[in-house]
Amino acid sequence: MARVKGSVATRKRRKRILKLAKGYYGAKHKLFKTAKEQVMNSYYYAFRDRRQKKRDFRKLWIARINAAARMNGLSYSKLMHGLKLADIEVNRKMLADIAIADAAAFTALAEEAKKALAK
């Protein structure tokens, strides 16, 4: 029978993968092969979703701005165009925050947008 000499490195590699797979469901945190596959998938999901998160937040901000704009008699696109014409530079993140936290300030911005659109 051949002599095995890679036990330390093999054990270290397997322990590292199983440690990364801690908390996974079923065999995915117990068996090396399935744990390794799941860890590789997890890295893929993390990479993909770091980019997806940016899209998701932008969608959320736009939905919030649209809801607040419609309460003030404007659509989202008309509000954004009106703000651009009025030279009011405020990003979607801040605008969504204003819409939730300070309705009066958002109404003032909407009125400015309406004035700019009327010109």
Swiss-Prot record:
Listed PANTHER family: 39S RIBOSOMAL PROTEIN L20
UniProt KW keywords: Ribonucleoprotein, Ribosomal protein, RNA-binding, rRNA-binding
Lineage, highest ranks first: Bacteria, Bacillati, Bacillota, Bacilli, Lactobacillales
Function per UniProt: Binds directly to 23S ribosomal RNA and is necessary for the in vitro assembly process of the 50S ribosomal subunit. It is not involved in the protein synthesizing functions of that subunit.
GO molecular-function term, one example from the UniProt record: structural constituent of ribosome
NCBIfam families reported in the protein's UniProt record: rplT_bact
A GO BP entry: translation
InterPro entries, sorted: Ribosomal_bL20, RIBOSOMAL_L20_CS, Ribosomal_protein_bL20_C
Protein known as: Large ribosomal subunit protein bL20
Stated family: Belongs to the bacterial ribosomal protein bL20 family.
Organism: Lactococcus lactis subsp. lactis (strain IL1403) (Streptococcus lactis)
SUPFAM superfamilies cross-referenced by the UniProt entry: Ribosomal protein L20 (SSF74731)
Record's GO cellular component terms: ribonucleoprotein complex; ribosome
